[in-house]
Structures are given as structure tokens and as C-alpha cells.
Regions:
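Conserved catalytic-site region of short-chain dehydrogenase/reductase
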Residues: 2-15, 28, 59-63
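Active-site Tyr-X1-5-Lys
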Residues: 13, 24-53
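The catalytic Tyr-centered alpha-helix of NAD(P)H-dependent dehydrogenases
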Residues: 28-32, 56, 69, 100
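Flexible, glycine-rich beta-alpha linker
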Residues: 52-72
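A short C-terminal helix-loop "cap" of Rossmann-like NAD(P)-dependent dehydrogenase/epimerase domains
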Residues: 59, 75-89, 145-150
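Substrate-positioning beta->alpha
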Residues: 68-76, 82, 89-112, 119-120
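Mid/C-terminal beta-alpha module of Rossmann-like enzyme folds, strongest
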Residues: 82, 110-170
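Residue-level signal for the nucleotide or nucleotide-sugar donor/cofactor binding architecture
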Residues: 99-102, 130, 174
């Protein structure tokens, strides 16, 4: 079952989160994933249902494009290309992990049908976490253009009540892996 690292919620600051941590989801998406996990775990315990639960981190690939800390809007790449500054939440020190879809697919396929993995839960994350500031700087390096990163407090971002900033509230303003 494909769950999500978002089931851990935002309270943990442990580096990294472990599979046996208590689930504390804060979004409907994460709550639904946690509920599904509980259903499958119970089915495994009761009836030996053959389930392996995988919790991938922020997964990206050719269809989704590049994440951004404060929204899913891809215009930030264009802003960098044009030399315009971009916003980051707080000081950009919240950590995140990214997982390419090809790596996720490899892991998923490699576990298919492995009886020794039934009833187990695995975090599926990249081995190195990045801060959002490091991530944005790396994107600038790839594009070949440096722009100013404007730090805006989460509190100030929240005042605008812009729906696309919900990602920041629910996930990316916290250590998210």
C-alpha cells in the first residue's frame, strides 16, 4: 500500500522519522492514509492479509515538476530565470526529502510478493534531507542564475489566506520527512 510520510504530521523534529513513530496526521489526505494503514494492519493481524506499507516522502518526476516550499505553483522557476526574487517560508531551515518517481517505482517493485515484508512498514525517502533554502539554492545553481530569497514568516504568509500557501501550513514549514 502506498501511504505517505505525511502521516507523521508536523510535531516530530527527530532526524529522521522512524517507522514506529506514532502517527499524527494534520491534513485530510494524511488522515485518510493513516486510516487506510490501520485497516490494512488490522487485516494482516487478523487474517494474515499480505500487505506491505510504504511511506514515500515528497515524490517528484517529469509530470509533476519541481516542488516549492510555499506553494505548488511552478512560476518560481520562471522568476529565477528572469532574475526576480522568490519567497521562502521563515528562514528556509525546515528540512525535506525528495524522492524521484523512478526510485520509488524501483523500491515498490522490488518488494512485490516478498512474504518477509508482509505486515511491515517502510519509509521510502532519499538518504539526504535538504533544507528548503538549500533546495532553492540548488535549483538556482542548475538554472545558472542567483536571485534573492526573501524570508517571510509563516505567520505573515498565513495572513494572506491564499489557498496555494496551504502546502506550507500543512507540511513544508515543518521538518517533513
Amino acid at each position: 500500500f502506498c501511504s505517505s510520510a505525511s502521516v507523521y504530521g508536523v510535531e516530530y523534529s527527530s532526524d529522521p522519522k522512524k517507522e514506529d513513530f506514532l502517527l499524527k496526521p494534520v491534513t485530510r489526505y494524511a488522515s485518510n492514509k493513516a486510516d487506510a494503514e490501520a485497516f490494512f494492519v488490522e487485516a494482516h493481524k487478523k487474517d494474515k492479509f499480505p500487505i506491505t506499507i510504504l511511506r514515500p516522502s515528497l515524490t517528484y518526476g517529469p509530470k509533476l515538476g519541481m516542488y516549492r516550499q510555499i506553494s505548488t505553483d511552478p512560476s518560481w522557476i520562471d522568476r529565477i530565470r528572469k532574475g526576480k526574487p522568490i519567497l521562502i517560508c521563515d528562514d528556509g531551515s525546515a528540512r525535506c526529502q525528495f524522492l524521484h518517481v523512478d526510485d520509488a517505482a524501483y523500491i515498490f517493485v522490488s518488494l512485490l510478493g516478498k512474504e518477509e515484508c508482509f505486515g511491515e512498514v517502510y519509509n521510502v525517502v532519499h538518504k539526504k534531507p535538504y533544507t528548503w533554502k538549500e533546495y532553492h539554492i540548488e535549483a538556482m545553481n542548475v538554472i545558472g542564475k542567483k536571485v534573492e530569497l526573501i524570508e517571510v514568516s509563516f505567520k505573515d504568509l498565513s495572513k494572506f489566506k491564499i489557498p496555494r500557501f496551504g502546502l506550507c501550513q500543512d507540511y513544508t514549514s515543518h521538518d517533513a520527512y
